[in-house]
From Swiss-Prot:
GO molecular-function term, one example from the UniProt record: heme binding
Source species: Stachybotrys chlorohalonatus (strain IBT 40285)
Protein name per its UniProtKB record: Cytochrome P450 monooxygenase ATR14
Source taxon at top rank: Eukaryota
Gene: ATR14
Binding site for heme: 442
Enzyme Commission number(s) from the entry: 1.-.-.-
Amino acid sequence: MNVADIAMDLFRGAKGETISIFAIAKVTVTGVSRGLSKLVFGVVDQANLVNLGQYVVYSVVSMIYNITLHPLASFPGPVFWGASRWPSIWRLFKGRLVHDVHALHGQYGHVVRIAPNELAFSSAQAWKDIYGHKRGNNSMEEMPKFHKFYSGISKTPSIVSEPTRDGHRFIRRILSPAFSDKNLRELEPIVQGYISQFIDQLRSHCEDSTGSKVPLDLVSWYNSATFDIVGDLTFGRPFGSLEQGEEDPFIKDINHFAAVGGAMLIFTSHFPGRGILRFLASLGKVFQNGQEKHVTKMEESLVDRMKNKSSRPDIIDGLVKEKDGFQIDYDRVLENAAAITMAGSETTASQLSGLTALLLQNPNCLERLKKEVRSAFKSDKDITSTSSLVGVWQYSANHSPRNFTYPDEFRPDRWLDDRDQKEYEHDHGDAMQPFSVGPRDCPSQK
């Protein structure tokens, strides 16, 4: 007899009716607890023994239910992962969860059960089904979010942690102008300035006083650069790491906070309770200290920005500006500013660090990249000055032999789908733009 058959026998009464699993747990727990209490009475505290017995029996019965009768029991995945969340939590704290889930997808396919009530997907269609907009007759605009996880991030929700559709739409609408093409182009010179400062600092630190080469911690330098850039774009001033020539301790603290905090959020969202929180609090000093320093730094930057606002636009301008007689409260402004800082700095630094490591490990890719970059401009003189006048002359572009075969002949067949591919293979059809391109193209061209 297999496990499923045994479980089904447990859940059937003498007359064949199905018994509630929780009723079984209650009866079994009581019997086991009493028996154990009598066995070791006077040696172990009876109340604690009863609690232990209840926990053990309830856990066993729950696992049997999860692998036999649970609505997700038929989905592929390891038995122990489906029986309890502890296997995934254990791998989470070991830092192996992402890699182990990837291995499970290789074994079981695009859909894997990784916890009693959780499925992991890896297909392209799953992106649209889970996160995409719902269309047609479906009244639900998006799939509901897991409130226990989102509510654990912060008391005041940000654009990252807002679980409701209306709340997220509200914050997104306020922040959207800051990320428009026009606004980002206006901020581009600021970013370029910090990139130049970053490169200058690398050059000045890659040699010691004797002229010998010195290894650099690029992860630290990338963090310094990205935090300074995002700090200036968000609050109107950098955090000062590039100017100091070393990574600010604050950056290290909040990076540790982010790493530990992510694991703690997942854990507490599935295992709520005061005992769990006290246990994690005893282990999470890094998380607590990092969170406090992060909040303090964000508050200092926000207060300074609100007192000394320049005429230059920044990312949180829409959050602090009163509109239609309404202004967002301070806590929500602070929470969103902190979220933007984290989202735009550490993530970019991690990507650049990984990209650098992979390029160094793959010399052929590095050589190709170097060739593309260095062949674009041989010197600074090749870059057009910002004070110069530039424009595309349509007649020249349309009649250039570099753009079209037989440019001065009437050959409308060049635009047809059934054209002679070989004859017109060198044509650059996008060189002809009678309606212009960009934000000032003809609105009625289509």
